[in-house]
Structures are given as structure tokens and as C-alpha cells.
Amino acid sequence: MIFDTEKTAVREDGLKIGYGLIHGNDRIVIIKAGAGGNCIGAEEKYLKMARLLHDTYGCTVLCLSNYANDSFARGDVAVIRELIAEMGGEVELYYIGNSNGSTQGLLTATKYFAFRRMVLVNMPLMLNFHRIKEALTRADTEIRFVYGEGDPSISYVPFLRNASSKEGNLARAEIVTVDGADHNFAGMTDVFIQQCGSVIRD
């Protein structure tokens, strides 16, 4: 199992970037790895997810590495814009983020792109919760949060639920907890892929 296109490069500013692309229709699913992760993922979870989404919906899937906390702004934006231009500009965007990839998606990606739907898995809630709330009220998209019951942020999920019942766009958020799952969904790759696959609902 491989990507149609896979590339790794080092930018002039020293940022290492890597991505894998599967070509499909005008629906683009962007998958952002957790901190330090490559575009394939442990047990090939991002690649497997990308192939499943493509085989099921015919969509284009772009998997992005995550070698820096600001890698989306510094490298990914240009890659995504180039892909959109190559596809003629009329596309529908979806986003899946894992851990820090979720944080970069919510805090940064929503400033650059309009997503129809986002799935954010085990996004850390311990730091800068006020920034998360601000981003949620700003982001005009449907968001599904997924947390493993063993994730360090699970004790903060009630605060997220409370905010989602009171504030603007937060009311559109869906929050799911997964029994038996830790931060990495260790031994539960199939469940991880299943949860993320809900990014498209047709």
C-alpha cells in the first residue's frame, strides 16, 4: 500500500516537510499527523485511512507530516494552495487532525481555509483552553471531537461540553469518547480509522 505521490523536503528556513497524496475527486480530505509524526503514521494508520476514504468516497486525500508546532502555517498552507490550484480551485475541504495536528487544524488551518467538516482526535486541552474556545467560535464548520478514555485531556472534556452548550458555533460541536483508547489508540488502529472516517457523511 502506497501513496500516489509522496514527497519529503527541507525548506530554506530549515523546516522539514513531508506529505503523501492520493488523487481523487474535488473533495479533499487533509490528514495532519501528531507532533513528530510522518505522513504514513504508526502502523500505517494515516495511509490506511487515506486509502479507505478514497476507495469509499473517491476523494482526494493529502496526508501531512508534523515536524514542528507551526508546520501548518510555515509549510502546509503552500502545499494545500498548490493542490487546490492544480485541481482548478473549486474544491470542498475536510480536515482530520491527530493530537497536535488537531490543535494546528483548529487554531491555524481554520484561519486559512474553510472546511466543511473537521474531526479532531485527542486534541490537548490542558493549555490555552481560552484560545481553543476562541477558535471554535470563529471556525464556521462542523467539528467532531474524539477522545480516548485514557487520554490525558479526558478530564477537561466536561469543560468542552459545557462550552459547547453555551457559545455560538460551539453548539455545532459533537464530542465522542472511546472506551479503552489511550492517547495513541494503541492496539486500536482500526477504531481510530473508523472514528476519523466519519469526516465525510454521505
Each language-model region and where it sits:
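Gly/Ala-rich beta-loop-alpha elbow adjacent to hydrolase catalytic centers
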Residues: 96-105
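N-terminal cap/lid segment of alpha/beta-hydrolase-fold proteins
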Residues: 1-24
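Alpha/beta-hydrolase active-site loop
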Residues: 45, 70-88
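Active-site nucleophile loop of the alpha/beta-hydrolase fold
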Residues: 119-128, 148-150
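Conserved alpha/beta-hydrolase "acid-adjacent" motif
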Residues: 152-159
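Short, surface-exposed "cap/lid" segments of acyl-processing enzymes
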Residues: 13-14, 22-66
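Short beta-strand/loop motif that positions the catalytic acidic residue
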Residues: 139, 145-147
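C-terminal catalytic histidine-bearing segment of alpha/beta-hydrolase fold enzymes
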Residues: 73-74, 169-202
